[in-house]
């Protein structure tokens, strides 16, 4: 079973669009233990060495929601950190240190919308791992 307290999102910049912030807040109410850090830059040294780092990037690998669930469950009890860049993406030196490059879709999304989609997918993955009816494949 996957729990929100093992998952963190590190994102560059603050969300400016109210409707996106409201959407994220709706999912945060369902997952109060999910950590979302917004800052001006990534400090990868602050992420513990034994944590899993997943960078969201357009050149990453895509998974179905059930495949992503299986992948994250394979990380056992490790903390999982998702990194989302700004409009310029994630610097290559940080991508090189990640465990996985993840693409949410072959489509390109604005970084703020990608954050909302990621939060929804995290909720979906947790629901799948818990046997909740939220995900109806």
UniProtKB/Swiss-Prot annotation:
Entry keywords, A to Z: Cytoplasm, Methyltransferase, rRNA processing, S-adenosyl-L-methionine, Transferase
Gene Ontology molecular function terms on file: rRNA (pseudouridine-N3-)-methyltransferase activity
Function: Specifically methylates the pseudouridine at position 1915 (m3Psi1915) in 23S rRNA.
Cellular localisation: Cytoplasm
GO CC aspect terms: cytoplasm
Subunit structure: Homodimer.
Disulfide bonds: none
Group of enzyme by EC: transferase
Domain of life: Bacteria
EC number: 2.1.1.177
Gene designation per UniProt: rlmH
Matching HAMAP family: 23SrRNA_methyltr_H
Reactions catalysed, as given in the entry: pseudouridine(1915) in 23S rRNA + S-adenosyl-L-methionine = N(3)-methylpseudouridine(1915) in 23S rRNA + S-adenosyl-L-homocysteine + H(+)
Binding annotation for S-adenosyl-L-methionine: 56, 85, 104-109
UniProt name for this protein: Ribosomal RNA large subunit methyltransferase H
Family annotation (CDD domains): RlmH-like
Protein family membership: Belongs to the RNA methyltransferase RlmH family.
């Amino acid at each position: 079973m996957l729990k929100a307290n093992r998952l963190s999102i590190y994102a560059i910049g603050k969300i400016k669009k109210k409707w996106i912030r409201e959407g994220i807040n709706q999912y945060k109410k369902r997952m109060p233990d999910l950590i979302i850090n917004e800052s001006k830059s990534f400090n990868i040294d602050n992420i513990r060495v034994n944590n899993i780092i997943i960078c969201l990037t357009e050149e990453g690998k895509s998974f179905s929601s059930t495949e992503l669930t299986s992948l994250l469950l394979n990380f056992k009890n490790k903390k999982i950190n998702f990194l989302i860049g700004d409009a310029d993406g994630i610097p290559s030196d940080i991508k090189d240190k990640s465990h996985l490059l993840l693409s949410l879709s072959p489509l390109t999304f604005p970084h703020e919308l990608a954050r909302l989609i990621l939060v929804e997918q995290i909720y979906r993955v947790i629901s799948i791992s818990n046997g909740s009816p939220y995900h109806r494949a």
